[in-house]
Amino acid sequence: MKKVSIYTDGACSGNPGDGGWGAILIYGNHEKEVSGFEKDTTNNRMELVAAINALKMLKEPCEVDLYSDSAYLVNGFLQNWVEKWKKNGWKTSNKEEVKNMELWQELDRLSNIHKIRWIKVKGHSDNEYNNRCDKLATDEIKKNSKK
């Protein structure tokens, strides 16, 4: 299985508001940057979308180290939220529908294809790749938002 590192970040101008996401995939000496934009979204959705789109770039099952500064994204798997939600019919402990359910379901599907290690990094720190992802995300907002 190929080993790939993925860094992701999401950003929002207003919450909700215009959002951007960015990701960097690293395999050996190769790097690929991807990014995108959505209107009327939230920062949490952008964090999930960044991870989904990065994982969808992989053409075969891989061992993935996925780095994110989003506790929301990382804890979904490290704290077993996703497993609990699935057992509860995608309802929270308060019997409410899980927010961003369709995105969590897609991440769950992708996590069954790839062997993913979810790694929390400190946001806006000295992590070069996280900072680059943040710039990709915010550049998408600047490029696509109405002035």
Curated annotation (Swiss-Prot):
The keyword Nucleotide-binding does not apply. One of its GO terms (biological process) is DNA replication, removal of RNA primer. Keywords: Cytoplasm, Endonuclease, Hydrolase, Magnesium, Metal-binding, Nuclease. Disulfide bonds: none annotated. GO terms for molecular function: magnesium ion binding; nucleic acid binding; RNA-DNA hybrid ribonuclease activity. It is an enzyme of class 3 (hydrolase). Mg(2+) 2 binds at residues 9, 134. Gene3D superfamilies: Ribonuclease H-like superfamily/Ribonuclease H. It is found in: Cytoplasm. GO terms for cellular component: cytoplasm. Its cofactor is Mg(2+). The keyword Phosphoprotein does not apply. Monomer. Endonuclease that specifically degrades the RNA of RNA-DNA hybrids. Belongs to the RNase H family. This is Ribonuclease H. It comes from Acetivibrio thermocellus (strain ATCC 27405 / DSM 1237 / JCM 9322 / NBRC 103400 / NCIMB 10682 / NRRL B-4536 / VPI 7372) (Clostridium thermocellum).
